[in-house]
């Protein structure tokens, strides 16, 4: 076997975060000539203290962490995971709060964009008794009547243009 399928063992005080694939997990991303590609969501999982201050990132998808978008040109996709981006508070030379290709995100676990549900195991830092787990999930080109592809930059419902997000990201907190 070319892979190692070790079982993950959980100990006292470990935290398991489970994201389950729903019917809209894979989304049609238009390529060209009416051809679509099944596109999984972008995801970030991070911790905040009880006052809402960012502590650390537990997991973020590889594409946003490294800016390795396909067919995005120079669009850094600032609409992809905006709450996570701003929560980190790291402003880059171009004024955006997103990692760059030259300065990728390396502080946490990054992974390929999952095509299925997955689990994340977390061991809270020593002494960290109370915290909030946040999860932000977003799909590219998830347009609707309120967030149309035709919205122009400057419009209140603009979400990145024809390859933007469409609807805003969904954020969960526990």
Predicted regions and their residues:
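Bacterial Sec-dependent signal peptides at the C-terminal "C-region" and cleavage site
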Residues: 1-8
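Structured domain cores in non-transmembrane regions
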Residues: 37, 48-148
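Exposed beta-strand and adjacent loop surfaces of beta-rich binding modules
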Residues: 14, 40-44, 130-132
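Short, low-complexity, polar/charged sequence segments that are solvent-exposed and flexible
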Residues: 35-41, 77, 153-156
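Short amphipathic, basic-aromatic surface patches that mediate peripheral association
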Residues: 15-38, 63, 143
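Charged alpha-helical initiation segments
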Residues: 7, 13-15
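Short beta-strand elements
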Residues: 147-174
């Amino acid at each position: 076997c070319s892979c190692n399928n070790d079982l993950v063992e959980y100990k006292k005080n470990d935290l398991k975060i489970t994201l389950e694939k729903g019917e809209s997990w894979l989304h049609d991303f238009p390529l060209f000539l009416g051809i679509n590609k099944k596109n999984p969501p972008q995801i970030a999982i991070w911790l905040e203290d009880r006052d809402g201050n960012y502590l650390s990132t537990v997991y973020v998808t590889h594409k946003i962490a490294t800016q390795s978008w396909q067919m995005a040109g120079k669009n850094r996709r600032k609409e992809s995971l905006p709450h996570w981006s701003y929560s980190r508070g790291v402003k880059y030379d171009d004024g955006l709060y997103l990692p760059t290709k030259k300065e990728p995100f390396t502080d946490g676990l990054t992974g390929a964009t999952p095509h299925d549900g997955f689990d994340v195991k977390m061991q809270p830092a020593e002494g960290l008794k109370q915290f909030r787990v946040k999860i932000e999930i977003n799909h590219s080109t998830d347009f609707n009547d309120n967030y149309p592809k035709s919205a122009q930059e400057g419009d209140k419902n603009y979400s990145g243009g024809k390859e933007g997000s469409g609807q805003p990201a969904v954020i969960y907190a526990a």
